[in-house]
């Protein structure tokens, strides 16, 4: 990846992140009248990355490609069984975990977290909202079999079978895409299969079409 220092609005503060270097998959700087047609290809990010940056560019077209992450920094579990003080959950195949001294940790290339924030999804109502996190008040974790975990709690709310929890660190050190001091930009038929700690941010730019 290209590693370039950028200060981006609403990302993690200088106090928490003294080195705001971005790790960039597709980096366009001071270019004019360039079209990149992915013809349906997928740009697969590994680790915490900013998928693309357009800096001081004009007349740029990015089109017909997908952006995805090998191991998204937002992890996911589905509730298979629930008791008063425990959950049994199915871990999504793209979510990596490790258990050390009965403590659960999520990780990927260059990142890890044990706490963070969560949102939950109800399949029946098709509603998603910010919620209690399955990492809160967690006493111990046991792997029943690969990608199926027993989570025991000091206390927990009732959550409901087949509730899906998505968890992430609240640390925003990268964005999904960044357009800076540019104009006349067209983002056409780009599928973001995962938006990381932030979406696409445009700063000091004009005439952006998506």
Can you annotate each of these PLM segments?
Residues 36, 74-83, 121, 127-144:
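Short, exposed beta-strand/loop patches in secreted or surface proteins that constitute
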Residues 2-35, 44-63, 71-87, 170-183, ...:
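Extracellular beta-strand-rich solenoid/capping regions of secreted or surface-exposed proteins
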Residues 19, 37-47, 65-76, 120, ...:
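Beta-strand-rich solenoid/repeat architectures in extracellular/passenger domains
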Residues 66-68, 95-133, 156-182, 190:
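Extended Gly/Ser/Thr-rich low-complexity repeat segments
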Residues 85-93, 139-156:
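Generic recognition of long tandem-repeat/solenoid scaffolds
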Residues 148-157, 193, 198-201:
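Charge-rich, low-hydrophobicity low-complexity segments
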Residues 185-200, 206-210:
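Active-site pocket-lining segments that scaffold enzyme catalytic pockets across diverse folds
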